[in-house]
Amino acid sequence: MEHLERCAWVLRGTLVRAAVRRYLPWALAASMLAGSLLKELSPLPESYLSNKRNVLNVYFVKVAWAWTFCLLLPFIALTNYHLTGKAGLVLRRLSTLLVGTAIWYVCTAIFSNVEHYTGSCYQSPALEGVRNEPLSKQQCHGQGGFWHGFDISGHSFLLTFCALMIVEEMAVLHEVKTDRSHCLHVAITALVVALGFLTFIWVWMFLCTAVYFHNLSQKVFGTLFGLLGWYGTYGFWYLKSFSPGLPPQSCSSNLKQDSYKR
């Protein structure tokens, strides 16, 4: 338990700062551009991380929203109820996860449709021999073809959105004080460690996407969708009264605190 608490203390000191919430979006955008330029001008040699079958990609990134949802749900419920003691307010705050799910679903559907309507089925990876019959991506692959369209980077979108959402929700830790002997302390500490490591995985894999996968325009659009999803909620809508609201900063039920305003 001592090691877990020490790890949680380090992660809190790293991710809960207001400066992190303020500058992380800019850092992600800048690293995406820098990584993309590196990929175009001086590609890195292939490595384990450039293989789409690597463990982090298969078991974490491909289900990034599921990981984020499942860890934020108990974290938001426990911390918000601890601070406010109001079940209704906790349910209201938990609706941020429904909003996030809707953003994830709509954006991925948009990306899929863009790739479909801009794509064609080819007979080889060299994009030779276009098949003229109307095919979907799935039908193309099923017939041994190769689909090529404008593939907006879903990883750039989702990893940006998930990392920023976790950092926003962890800001509540400024106010959370629990008795070390209480089971709530153990639960929150474990969730802090899990969410902290998850955030670092998302940022690291975002950087790997920048230097290994997609072209610049695909990553720009993906990252832009992630930033818009974050800012449209935490930077705009959640500041309004008719919204899930921001994480509480004090024991009052007021969710609109100045330190969260940008």
UniProtKB/Swiss-Prot annotation:
The chain crosses the membrane at residues 24-44, 58-78, 94-114, 146-166, 186-206, 219-239. Residues 1-23, 79-93, 167-185, 240-262 are cytoplasmic. Residues 45-57, 115-145, 207-218 are lumenal. Pfam families: FIT. Keywords: Endoplasmic reticulum, Hydrolase, Lipid metabolism, Membrane, Transmembrane, Transmembrane helix. The active site is at H155, H214. It is a multi-pass membrane protein. The keyword Membrane applies. One of its GO terms (biological process) is phospholipid biosynthetic process. It catalyses: an acyl-CoA + H2O = an acyl-4'-phosphopantetheine + adenosine 3',5'-bisphosphate + 2 H(+); (9Z)-octadecenoyl-CoA + H2O = S-(9Z-octadecenoyl)-4'-phosphopantetheine + adenosine 3',5'-bisphosphate + 2 H(+); (5Z,8Z,11Z,14Z)-eicosatetraenoyl-CoA + H2O = S-(5Z,8Z,11Z,14Z-eicosatetraenoyl)-4'-phosphopantetheine + adenosine 3',5'-bisphosphate + 2 H(+); hexadecanoyl-CoA + H2O = S-hexadecanoyl-4'-phosphopantetheine + adenosine 3',5'-bisphosphate + 2 H(+). It is found in: Endoplasmic reticulum membrane. Its EC number is 3.6.1.-. GO terms for molecular function: coenzyme A diphosphatase activity; diacylglycerol binding; triglyceride binding. It is an enzyme of class 3 (hydrolase). One of its GO terms (cellular component) is endoplasmic reticulum membrane. InterPro entries: FIT, FITM1/2. Fatty acyl-coenzyme A (CoA) diphosphatase that hydrolyzes fatty acyl-CoA to yield acyl-4'-phosphopantetheine and adenosine 3',5'-bisphosphate. Preferentially hydrolyzes unsaturated long-chain acyl-CoA substrates such as oleoyl-CoA/(9Z)-octadecenoyl-CoA and arachidonoyl-CoA/(5Z,8Z,11Z,14Z)-eicosatetraenoyl-CoA in the endoplasmic reticulum (ER) lumen. This catalytic activity is required for maintaining ER structure and for lipid droplets (LDs) biogenesis, which are lipid storage organelles involved in maintaining lipid and energy homeostasis. Belongs to the FIT family. FIT2 subfamily. This is Acyl-coenzyme A diphosphatase FITM2. It comes from Sus scrofa (Pig). The gene is FITM2.
